[in-house]
């Protein structure tokens, strides 16, 4: 699973008319134009709804009541809902993209009546769920059957929920059993403790959230002025694990980047976005509507609710663009154009698979370079070399970057340094001349 991947998370019930059929050539074509490799469809397995214990009106996608069914409300003809789901997956494949769904090994819905062994209690405030009993010897086999069922529908991988609450060795056995039957299947883990990264990679996961690393640091830089030096420290901590990380600034659990509770607007976060997308070969995830500056202003907590039917304004605007060819409001169009520019750069082979060189250490004393507010790095391969400056400060950055000889030789550069400028909270890119 080498190379940077672009993953797009979406809650289908809030996209278009909320049906599998909405995922057609216009929708997939739009995501293909962004360079998306995998679409993570959240809320596919049938979850509890319409009962007193559920959260919100439709209920939580993470309280699954039947692991071998899809939500009837996603189908035009509920009696054919599995076939409609398979057809959607096939359309994605025809458009050159792969599909992920959630695998939730820690819990099921409170009204679950299937064959997975379940305890009588729940974790935390997940009152609509019951804990899966991983001490029961039947559980691994039951969970393997779930994964086989969905992989047989054409699904290309799984985003695995809250894996730190489940024995890693047992998850590892399941993943190992899936590999021969479904070569190329992807397992992406929601992991929060950096101290657990190695253990879950050893268990066979392909990608891990870098939540307590890149996400927490970038968020704290934006909100509280945390030093950009800590990005270097995280990079050094990750070492050889970097290609297996998933960078993101939004998902369904986190507050919207443009919300008042986070950056406040996209213009305050371009340096962070550029870092998350372009630094090393870690994969990158977008949350639907992020690319047009959706700010969840309809909510009190800065999050797009996964418990309701209400479609965010930014996603509604996207639907008008995708299905009717309507123009986005100017502010949203400007944000989308900026994301397109960065995503286009990220698709270049040098950014997908090339080497990374953190240049902060050799520029700490350079005039104009603020190691707490600036982060500079290079990406290079046999064909290209690029310089990237991320400016987390509130004033324009103008720096004459110095290169150590070992980097210059490794990247095949003629120059010994370059001057580069980046706007406040923004970034700058420069392509080097390489030796012929």
Feature-to-residue mapping (PLM):
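Short catalytic/ligand-binding loop motif for oxyanion handling, primarily in non-cytosolic enzymes
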Residues: 47-53, 107-113, 166-170, 195-199, ...
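Loop/helix patches that line or flank the sugar-binding groove of alpha-linked glycan CAZymes
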Residues: 49, 251, 256-398, 403, ...
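Substrate-binding/active-site clefts of carbohydrate-active enzymes
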Residues: 1-38, 42-153, 174-182, 186, ...
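Active-site-proximal helices and loops of the catalytic beta/alpha 8
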Residues: 145-148, 156, 161-245, 262, ...
